[in-house]
């Protein structure tokens, strides 16, 4: 009986790991809009300071379905020079010059999946190496820390008063590191990232057999830009996701977006074995807005109203001229 109860709790902890690359890390349909969420090497890659907010509600209509809320900030430490202006009060003003190679970023998230909740942050450092006038090689390292919480109030237990369940530490804190690398040119880009590199251990109680190890996750991204004319551009891209479970958690997003005057875009994405995704977005001055709808290809579509993802971003400052060729969502 004791082993049966332990099995129930174990299944509750890993119940969502059969889909979406074990879904121990947040999943995003609009990965092109903010690559920094999955790859720290993108921090400050375009020379701007950017704030991005993302809300994702998965399988709307199903109680305790996955949901994710994320806020990120990234910037480039551009080298500066000073110019003097003749005014009634003499001041020094800064203007960007060509040089800065360091990018910094921060990322806060709250990810809920059934009775499991992860809340944490990431602090990233990126180093960008210019190659010629329109190529860039980047590396990024991020320190992460998050709270893993287990809410058994949302679970159906055989015996909620059993001391075996009450011995579990339902809130634990896990530090870890993420790594990323990317290469960008005017017409294409590729990137690779690893998350949860240290495979943090979930110390769920005093007994050794209660401990569980988090999975390492791997992300491979790539995309290209094909300019049709001065108004239209086609942007195909792909995201490959896996984990230490390898082929059991292998998943791919294949996406094509069409841009009009860099102010509007729409696209279609296919997530293998999971969903078709419709997406659209627009830019107004320095503000960006995007929406994605996931139509499930599995039987869960009969019980939900699809998955919805909304993103908003704003860019501050003036990018150094040499980075403007990168600046496209």
Segments from the language model and where they lie:
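Bacterial N-terminal signal peptides that target proteins for export
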Residues: 1-8
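Bacterial N-terminal signal peptides
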Residues: 8-15
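Subset of outer-membrane beta-barrel
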Residues: 23-329
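Sec/Tat signal peptide C-region and signal peptidase I cleavage site
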Residues: 17-22
């Amino acid at each position: 009986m004791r082993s049966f109860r332990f099995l129930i709790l174990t299944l509750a902890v890993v119940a969502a790991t059969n889909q979406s690359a074990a879904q121990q890390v947040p999943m995003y349909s609009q990965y092109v809009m903010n690559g920094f969420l999955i790859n720290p090497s993108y921090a400050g890659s375009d020379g701007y300071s950017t704030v991005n907010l993302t809300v994702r509600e998965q399988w709307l209509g199903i109680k305790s379905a996955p949901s994710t809320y994320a806020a990120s900030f990234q910037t480039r430490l551009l080298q500066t020079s000073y110019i003097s202006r003749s005014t009634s009060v003499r001041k020094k003003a800064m203007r960007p010059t060509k040089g800065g190679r360091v990018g910094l970023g921060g990322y806060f998230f709250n990810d809920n999946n059934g009775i499991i909740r992860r809340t944490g942050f990431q602090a990233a450092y990126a180093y960008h190496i210019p190659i010629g006038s329109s190529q860039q090689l980047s590396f990024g390292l991020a320190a992460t820390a998050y709270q893993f919480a287990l809410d058994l109030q949302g679970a159906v237990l055989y015996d909620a008063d059993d001391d075996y369940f009450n011995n579990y530490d339902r809130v634990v804190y896990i530090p870890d590191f993420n790594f990323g690398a990317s290469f960008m040119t005017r017409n294409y880009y590729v990137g690779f990232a690893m998350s949860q590199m240290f495979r943090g251990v979930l110390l769920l109680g005093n007994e050794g057999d209660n401990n569980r190890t988090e999975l390492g996750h791997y992300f491979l991204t790539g995309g290209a830009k094909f300019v049709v004319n001065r108004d239209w551009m086609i942007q195909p891209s792909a995201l490959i996701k896996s984990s230490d479970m390898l082929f059991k958690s292998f998943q791919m997003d294949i996406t094509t977006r069409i841009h009009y005057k860099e102010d509007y875009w729409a696209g279609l994405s296919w997530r293998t074995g999971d969903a078709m995704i419709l997406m659209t977005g627009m830019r107004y001055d320095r503000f960006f807005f995007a929406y994605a709808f996931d139509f499930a290809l599995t039987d869960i579509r009969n019980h939900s109203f699809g998955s919805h993802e909304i993103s908003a971003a704003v860019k501050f400052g003036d990018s150094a001229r040499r980075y403007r060729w990168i600046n496209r969502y």
